[in-house]
């Protein structure tokens, strides 16, 4: 639609003339309680201070309003939500694939990568794939998984086993390790 009017997004808080109550519980600029006053008196006080009257909790009886700079309030609110998002760590599941015949050199490289994943706080999924005639030697695959478990959980105390395969699923065995919580 060309040339149409842009709809303003609804504000989460009503301000100044948008407040519909006749009486409000007023809080000052510094957070001090002023008490229950009429809406006109509250608007006058906000105008004297050169800031806005913002309805904080509209469902209260009477509604709670605060005298504050609304633009600054929105900025602080968005800043704090961004800060909270930044602090949240998304735990990823990283996968390393082994084969029953994985050589020692390759095993060490994959083990180093697993250690790095666990130190970064990510979970590690170890997939052991069987091809062709390897299916007849599933005990070799279990030995590889037990070796990984011994190296990471028992010897270095880096991880805890979240799930350990008891049998083969399709043509693979899957073990999941989670990083150990540090005190």
From Swiss-Prot:
GO terms (BP aspect): ribosome disassembly
- What's a single GO CC term here? cytosol
Record-linked SUPFAM superfamilies: Translation initiation factor IF3, C-terminal domain, Translation initiation factor IF3, N-terminal domain
Ordered alphabetically, the record's keywords are: Cytoplasm, Initiation factor, Protein biosynthesis
Q: Name one Pfam family in it.
A: IF3_N
Subcellular compartments: Cytoplasm
Does the UniProt entry include the keyword Cytoplasm? yes
GO MF terms here are: ribosome binding; translation initiation factor activity
Task: Quote the PANTHER family the UniProt record gives.
Answer: TRANSLATION INITIATION FACTOR IF-3, TRANSLATION INITIATION FACTOR IF-3, MITOCHONDRIAL
Q: How does it assemble?
A: Monomer.
Q: Give the family, as the similarity comment puts it.
A: Belongs to the IF-3 family.
**HAMAP family this protein is in?**
IF_3 (MF_00080)
Q: What does this protein do?
A: IF-3 binds to the 30S ribosomal subunit and shifts the equilibrium between 70S ribosomes and their 50S and 30S subunits in favor of the free subunits, thus enhancing the availability of 30S subunits on which protein synthesis initiation begins.
Name used for this protein in its record: Translation initiation factor IF-3
């Amino acid at each position: 639609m060309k040339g149409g009017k842009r709809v303003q997004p609804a504000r989460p808080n009503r301000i100044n003339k948008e407040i519909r109550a006749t009486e409000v519980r007023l809080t000052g600029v510094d957070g001090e309680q002023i008490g229950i006053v009429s809406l006109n008196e509250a608007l006058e006080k906000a105008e004297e201070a050169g800031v806005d009257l913002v309805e904080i909790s509209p469902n209260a009886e009477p509604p709670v309003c605060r005298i504050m700079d609304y633009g600054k309030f929105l900025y602080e609110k968005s800043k704090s939500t961004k800060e909270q998002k930044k602090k949240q760590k998304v735990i990823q599941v990283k996968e390393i694939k082994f084969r029953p015949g994985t050589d020692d050199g390759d095993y060490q490289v994959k083990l180093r990568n697993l250690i790095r994943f666990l130190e970064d706080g990510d979970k590690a999924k170890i997939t052991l794939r069987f091809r062709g005639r390897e299916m007849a030697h599933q005990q070799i695959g279990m030995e590889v998984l037990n070796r990984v478990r011994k190296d990471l959980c028992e010897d270095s105390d880096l991880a805890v086993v979240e799930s350990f395969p008891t049998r083969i699923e399709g043509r693979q065995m899957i073990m999941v390790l989670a990083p150990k919580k540090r005190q």
